[in-house]
Curated annotation (Swiss-Prot):
Residues 133-228 form the LRAT domain. Gene3D superfamilies: endopeptidase domain like (from Nostoc punctiforme). PROSITE patterns: LRAT. This is Protein LRATD1. GO terms for cellular component: cytoplasm. GO terms for biological process: cell morphogenesis; cell motility. Pfam families: LRAT. May play a role in cell morphology and motility. It comes from Mus musculus. Keywords: Cytoplasm, Phosphoprotein. The lineage of its organism: Eukaryota, Metazoa, Chordata, Craniata, Vertebrata.
Amino acid sequence: MGNQLDRITHLNYSELPTGDPSGIEKDELRVGVAYFFSDEEEDLDERGQPDKFGVKGPPGCSPCPESPSRHHHHLLHQLVLNETQFSAFRGQECIFSKVTGGPQGADLSVYAVTALPAICEPGDLLELLWLQPATEQPAPAPHWAVYVGGGQVIHLHQGEIRQDSLYQAGAANVGRVVNSWYRYRPLVAELVVQNACGHLGLKSEEICWTNSESFAAWCRFGKREFKAGGEVPAGTQPPQQQYYLKVHLEENKVHTARFHSLEDLIREKRRIDASGRLRVLQELEDFVDDKE
């Protein structure tokens, strides 16, 4: 008969959700589980396939075709910009960081909007930017959106929550994934997409967010602080409940401003962003190999 080798199969595990669907944070010990794979193995990243992992929009949300895989054989142009960097705190707790450097430094690289579907997953937060010559007027504040798959985003635009093609949303020409900038615990991707789809079609008088960033961040984190009027009246919080925005300037200088609500802090941060000009510092070319 001879010896017969058993065929070894590999089981694929979807990512374990670490977010509380209720959006309520609890002070408790969390245990993380990490899986390490050899670089010699072909690791096919399937997280961008919403049907396989149940990331589907509820009724009323247009069906999202399967997102393109992250592994595509084409050239991605990665841009590094000269832009204002921020960090934000509530009391002593860091709640937002758009600062490079350090072990948890933010990646501020941007890509052409045509390249974003290859690096996005449903539920991702996107920041869309406008690059323009220095001779023109300053660009508007960065536009935020929730990626729902198939090159589609849901966003608050011109007083309406709508679903648009990524290439048409705000007519931006570059963008990036900004999931890690806010330090709150995220909801699972399916709930992020449901939050966004569940508000499609709302108009100004029905909307409780004052800008695209607050709406997109609420979809991902479920924090009422992102809503207009979602916190106690100004001036009644103790210092440990107030917000502080740090603007990181050149030569390691930092300007700090205090706010009574997250809504006010975000408004000021976006005002500073809109008043500056984005200038390309460095252009990198990254080849992404097709591993399929």
